[in-house]
């Protein structure tokens, strides 16, 4: 929910109580499945015109020729000195650069420890390019599973910038190559600072977190009795408090890391 409305693909979510044949199954988060069928439905195009790659440039759905297309883009960007404006124009024509930089900054700020070596998906429309986004044929990234973020596996001072630097996977390789460009470095830092002052500010993070916790709280006695995960309501409340601590303290560390360029080689 924190990333809804940002310039990359997200999946809608609904917190609900589930029953199967009348038996109580507890609190679940019903999430929109982002695949070629859903992207096609959202944008009014045939599913066969959608390619989705994941993780290490592996085909999830669509045309396998797009693996080579993406790898060429990554390889040529890695050979770029970061200064030639001609390649920046080419990069902009093949990748939604602003969306990608915002996606990278969001993942790092949210502290997603189950990324970038997995839970990475990116897609493009393969039909005749249209002038309007997102059907212009450019690669766009999808915010995937992030349940190991927001303090789940690391504190608010976690250096996700260093994690990206050391990951050695396509998404991090492309990002690091782009960071050779002074212009793109500035755009990335500006995107991150903009997130910290707006959509991912401590105030908004706290508001969204407290709203979701308030929605779930009436069910947590029954939910924990059913699953024992968390063990009981008190354990759930402690875990929510860890997330509150992350929401309140992450911005200070992320801002320092952005300004210090700790993600650079």
Give residue spans per PLM region.
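Short, small/polar residue-rich loop motifs at catalytic or cofactor-binding pockets
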Residues: 11-12
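ATP/NTP phosphate-donor binding region
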Residues: 35
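Extracellular cysteine-rich, disulfide-bonded domains and loops characteristic of secreted proteins
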Residues: 51-53
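Zn2+-dependent metallopeptidase catalytic core
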Residues: 1-8
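Middle-to-C-terminal accessory/interaction subdomains
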Residues: 5, 16-19, 23-24, 28, ...
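Catalytic cores of eukaryotic secretory-pathway lumenal/extracellular enzymes that build
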Residues: 41-48
